[in-house]
């Protein structure tokens, strides 16, 4: 009863299915939710284009997850990669674990956050006097099995971005202080957003994001009017608005859950894998991250459409998102908008433009 009352008073979130346009950003977010191993998404675009609204909307859309009750790491009751050490010990000792359903964690990382706030801290005094590892979890612990959102990621300290990307890639966070070490699961979808006018990310950091979506302000006057009207209507009667979209929200929720189940069975033919690597090679992409992410994203896209085999159309839809930020570019150029990727893709896959 208390939980239901709290839901009534929680801040209403604009429905994901009601968002007009910005298909590239919406697709990238959905694919990362289907397969978090894609490695997150970097969203770059103009101010006021709905970046934050869309990211909060996808978190609100997702189904609840089962976690061990009162556990700071949102531990899974059976998956060893998603549980903290205390839960592992409890299972080894044969203790029964109480679980609860919670909404997917959506953690905002403020620009002024310190390393201790992000990673967590160890109480050295307690460790020395009482001999216990007293750990105060940080934002990475909170974000386990959820979404970690960094607005204006291009303005965040580089060493903090490094920490976030390392945790997102490995799924673990390690805190070392005064010879004491603590490790806990930190598997999350990392979503960064920013405005290119305020500065770019270093290429090494950009490369670590699985996908890169670019969004532009809507130019069509009729679409602009629609966006303004829908936002005004939502602000006036949010609960009515949310109820109107509940059916579409549930349909998309079911589709994402089904895609997550189908994903392990999706196949990508050897010939297509070779062609993906040919595209990466011809574009002179450094390293192999581009190949790996494109393979994963293509499988997630096929699963999203209910197929168990990747098609050329699946690859065509995602390859620009996966590669555009990995190209070597002239310092005077703005980041490649994807034309170069599309051109090489069409050549290698023999598609007429």
Swiss-Prot record:
SUPFAM superfamilies xrefs: P-loop containing nucleoside triphosphate hydrolases (SSF52540)
Entry-linked CDD domains: AAA
Catalytic activity: protoporphyrin IX + Mg(2+) + ATP + H2O = Mg-protoporphyrin IX + ADP + phosphate + 3 H(+)
Predominant location category: plastid
Entry GO MF terms: ATP binding; ATP hydrolysis activity; magnesium chelatase activity
Residues engaged in binding ATP: 45-52
Gene Ontology, cellular component aspect: chloroplast
Top-level lineage group: Eukaryota
GO BP terms: chlorophyll biosynthetic process; photosynthesis
Pathway linked to the protein: Porphyrin-containing compound metabolism; chlorophyll biosynthesis
Assigned keywords, A-Z: ATP-binding, Chlorophyll biosynthesis, Chloroplast, Ligase, Nucleotide-binding, Photosynthesis, Plastid
Entry EC number(s): 6.6.1.1
Pfam families, per the entry: AAA_lid_2, Mg_chelatase
Stored Gene3D superfamilies: Magnesium chelatase subunit I, C-Terminal domain, P-loop containing nucleotide triphosphate hydrolases
Keyword Nucleotide-binding attributed: yes
Top enzyme category: ligase
Location(s), subcellular: Plastid, Chloroplast
Function as written in the Swiss-Prot or TrEMBL entry: Involved in chlorophyll biosynthesis; introduces a magnesium ion into protoporphyrin IX to yield Mg-protoporphyrin IX.
UniProt cross-references to NCBIfam families, sorted A to Z: BchI-ChlI (TIGR02030)
Family statement drawn from the similarity comment of this UniProt entry: Belongs to the Mg-chelatase subunits D/I family.
Descriptive protein name: Magnesium-chelatase subunit ChlI
The species this protein was found in: Trieres chinensis
